[in-house]
Amino acid sequence: MNYLEFEKPLSEIEGKAEELRALARGNREMDVEKEASALDKKAETLLKDLYKDLTPWRKCQVARHPDRPHCKDYIEGLFTEYTPLAGDRNFADDHAIMGGLARFNDNPVVVIGQEKGHDTKTRIERNFGMARPEGYRKAIRLMEMAHRFRLPVITLVDTPGAYPGKGAEERGQAEAIARATQKCLEIGVPLVAVVIGEGGSGGAVALATANRIAMLEHSVYSVISPEGCASILWKDAEKMREAAEALRLTAQDLHKLGVIDRIIKEPLGGAQRGRRETVDAVGKAIEMMLKELVGRKPEWLVKDRRNKFLDMGSKGLAA
């Protein structure tokens, strides 16, 4: 288990409990269960206190936790007959974006998501979830296919932002993001999005311009990272805590503002402490959102999606 900075007191207690049990495994005559159980209860109480009222900055840390389920985990856990499709038919295949045909609850769908990777090798391969233009063009290709065959689209958003490298800019990063956002608004099929970790700027919006948007309880969704905002406004990246407060980037704030439609509850201690439980909860949320949309006419779906985004800013601003 990887512990976040604010979880250090918890790591000490859980570490002691594990040490006691390790000693008992090596010496069967030792009876440490009573003491270890007391430490477990103490750890659970502390965990509840730590997660009872997380600050926006701490939610950012939880959203970035390396042990959270990623796009690949959700695809493997919720979808069957997944057939990945590669490439943008123009330049290359971007591994930061996964996507393909699959079945959800035995119904055919198109699933698209950003994948960060789970270790050093896969994080480099996936570019830490930061898509290049060819990734967004791959997403456009998949959405066009979904529109053609009348298949619902499910997107899983988890990115610090689109890749800002020189090559990406030369190949039209801004245009690719804009085209992907435009395509989201055009397709006449149900489109639902779930922010499963970080929803960073236009890199997230390009996949999240949906009829229905859900966020995991401790995920974040923002126009810029707190560090980036602090660097611009205060010329000091260390002011990220103040920036996180000002950005209103939590699921709770965004639900009040009408930016998202649903908050998916996470297990105590975050998705990283209950991966299977979190995957199942996301699956139930997707099922409920699709039920609201499947069977609607293409014209209704396009109008609903456009109105949703045109109306943003008219709710919750006085809060």
From Swiss-Prot:
Its EC number is 2.1.3.15. It holds the Pfam family ACCA. It catalyses: N(6)-carboxybiotinyl-L-lysyl-[protein] + acetyl-CoA = N(6)-biotinyl-L-lysyl-[protein] + malonyl-CoA. One of its GO terms (cellular component) is acetyl-CoA carboxylase complex. The keyword Lipid metabolism applies. InterPro entries: Acetyl_CoA_COase_a_su, ClpP/crotonase-like_dom_sf, COA_CT_C. Keywords: ATP-binding, Cytoplasm, Fatty acid biosynthesis, Fatty acid metabolism, Lipid biosynthesis, Lipid metabolism, Nucleotide-binding, Transferase. Pathway: Lipid metabolism; malonyl-CoA biosynthesis; malonyl-CoA from acetyl-CoA: step 1/1. It is found in: Cytoplasm. GO terms for molecular function: acetyl-CoA carboxylase activity; ATP binding; carboxyl- or carbamoyltransferase activity. Residues 38-292 form the CoA carboxyltransferase C-terminal domain. GO terms for biological process: fatty acid biosynthetic process; malonyl-CoA biosynthetic process. Acetyl-CoA carboxylase is a heterohexamer composed of biotin carboxyl carrier protein (AccB), biotin carboxylase (AccC) and two subunits each of ACCase subunit alpha (AccA) and ACCase subunit beta (AccD). Belongs to the AccA family. Component of the acetyl coenzyme A carboxylase (ACC) complex. First, biotin carboxylase catalyzes the carboxylation of biotin on its carrier protein (BCCP) and then the CO(2) group is transferred by the carboxyltransferase to acetyl-CoA to form malonyl-CoA. This is Acetyl-coenzyme A carboxylase carboxyl transferase subunit alpha. The lineage of its organism: Bacteria, Pseudomonadati, Pseudomonadota, Alphaproteobacteria, Rhodobacterales.
